[in-house]
Amino acid sequence: MSTVPSVQTFGKKKSATAVAHVKAGKGLIKVNGSPITLVQPEILRFKVYEPLLLVGLDKFANIDIRVKVTGGGHVSQVYAIRQAIAKGLVAYHQKFVDEQSKNELKKAFTSYDRTLLIADSRRPEPKKFGGRGARSRFQKSYR
């Protein structure tokens, strides 16, 4: 039984998590079982295309990417998907191609947008007493 070379990576944004399985194939990219061309909303579809367009479609010609995304809203999911795809491509090139092409990919991604490879660490601030939220306070009366 021959095993297909594959890597598994993830991307996160807020509470959205995308897991990408990258393996040798013929250039298919699927998100939750449907082609990448059907990602909704349409305006954010180009955000998902960014990793593909940055390095050229020739890098994706001989690999298949399957992405499963859960949690969060539409925008968070799109950012998690693009991060998972970018990280998956870098990991695949590191493991199965060569170190030089991996470094070229990393350089291209980080020079364009750092969040393609590094997760956004911002999280909601916890609520404190004396107000309705993290920073807002209840109204104060002097009389």
From Swiss-Prot:
Ribosomal protein keyword on record: yes
GO MF term list: RNA binding; structural constituent of ribosome
Signal sequence residues: none
BP GO annotations: maturation of SSU-rRNA from tricistronic rRNA transcript (SSU-rRNA, 5.8S rRNA, LSU-rRNA); translation
Cited InterPro entries: Ribosomal_Su5_D2-typ_SF, Ribosomal_uS9, Ribosomal_uS9_CS, Ribsml_uS5_D2-typ_fold_subgr
GO cellular component, one term: cytosolic small ribosomal subunit
Chain segments carrying region Disordered: 123-143
Record keywords, A-Z: Ribonucleoprotein, Ribosomal protein
Pfam families documented for this protein: Ribosomal_S9
Gene3D superfamilies: 3.30.230.10
Compositional bias segments (type: Basic residues): 134-143
Source organism, top-level taxon: Eukaryota
Database matches in PANTHER family: RIBOSOMAL PROTEIN S16, RIBOSOMAL PROTEIN S9
Family, similarity comment: Belongs to the universal ribosomal protein uS9 family.
Protein name: Small ribosomal subunit protein uS9
Organism listed in the record: Kluyveromyces lactis (strain ATCC 8585 / CBS 2359 / DSM 70799 / NBRC 1267 / NRRL Y-1140 / WM37) (Yeast)
Gene behind the chain: RPS16
